[in-house]
Amino acid sequence: MAAQLQYQGTGRRKNAVARVRLIPGEGKVTINKRELAEYFGKKTLEMIVQQPFGVTDTAGKYDVVALAHGGGTTGQAGALRLGIARALLKADPSLRPALKRAGFLTRDPRMKERRKYGLKKARKAPQFSKR
């Protein structure tokens, strides 16, 4: 059996990392061996993951097999979106302008700010009393 053609992409967002493989197929999305709807359970997060296909009119052309870990659900959805966009770019470099215009090729650099000593959270100070 011949090796099946597949494209890989890695996405990161906050503390989440997603390793994405695109395989020519009928549009099935599997994350950590679970269906997209079952994994996220929120329509908004499902939409975020599907966005690169909508922008490039490639919906239903590729199956997605992804491994996501770290962070929360929103971070993982963002990481998957970036990973899918990067994999689509490897599959068809002519999609670059559309993906770039939509902002799907940009890694969001915002991270959680570290907690400082003397404070309760990153910026929240303990209650101040004048007397």
Curated annotation (Swiss-Prot):
InterPro entries: Ribosomal_Su5_D2-typ_SF, Ribosomal_uS9, Ribosomal_uS9_bac/plastid, Ribosomal_uS9_CS, Ribsml_uS5_D2-typ_fold_subgr. Pfam families: Ribosomal_S9. One of its GO terms (molecular function) is structural constituent of ribosome. Residues 112-131 have a biased composition (Basic residues). SUPFAM superfamilies: Ribosomal protein S5 domain 2-like. Residues 102-131 are annotated as: Disordered. Coiled coil: none annotated. The keyword Ribosomal protein applies. PROSITE patterns: RIBOSOMAL_S9. GO terms for biological process: translation. One of its GO terms (cellular component) is cytosolic small ribosomal subunit. Keywords: Ribonucleoprotein, Ribosomal protein. Belongs to the universal ribosomal protein uS9 family. NCBIfam families: PRK00132.1. This is Small ribosomal subunit protein uS9.
